[in-house]
């Protein structure tokens, strides 16, 4: 009898573990996350204080200022001076926080999040890498 009860309990447990979750409506999931601002710049608004994008180009400078962004944090390890090239003369704080894509440590993530929080005292922050995918996605997700 005890063996029978054990088998029934195990069967119920396994059935519960294998039951698929209800599909989530993609539109409501994305509405809770980031909202697209400019597709060709891979620019998204995470919240009132954080934006994410790929490497900004000169044409993005005006929009960045219109959004009230005050700080631009570059996560790129190579070609770190592109912000100065594309965004010079703008009323923006340009900061470098290089992350080596294949060697990011928890300490690097924590320091980057601290820098974002510190810069948000001056206004919204834009964080980016080259494509706005891996490094930017990691930092945005941890934020």
Predicted regions and their residues:
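Positively charged n-region of N-terminal signal peptides that target proteins for export
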Residues: 1-4
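Hydrophobic helical h-region of N-terminal Sec-dependent signal peptides
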Residues: 6-14
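Cys-dependent protein tyrosine phosphatase-like superfamily
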Residues: 13, 17-126, 138-143
């Amino acid at each position: 009898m005890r063996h029978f009860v054990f088998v029934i309990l195990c069967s119920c447990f396994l059935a519960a573990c294998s039951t698929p979750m209800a599909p989530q409506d993609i539109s409501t999931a994305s509405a809770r996350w980031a909202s697209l601002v400019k597709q060709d710049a891979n620019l998204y608004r995470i919240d009132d204080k954080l934006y994410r994008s790929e490497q900004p180009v000169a044409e993005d400078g005006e929009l960045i200022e219109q959004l009230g962004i005050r700080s631009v944090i570059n996560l790129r390890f190579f070609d770190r001076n592109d912000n100065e090239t594309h965004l010079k003369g703008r009323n923006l704080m340009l900061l470098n926080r290089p992350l080596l894509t294949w060697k990011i440590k928890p300490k690097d993530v924590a320091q980057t999040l601290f820098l974002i929080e510190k810069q948000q005292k001056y206004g919204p922050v834009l964080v980016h890498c080259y494509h706005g995918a891996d490094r930017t996605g990691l930092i945005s997700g941890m934020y």
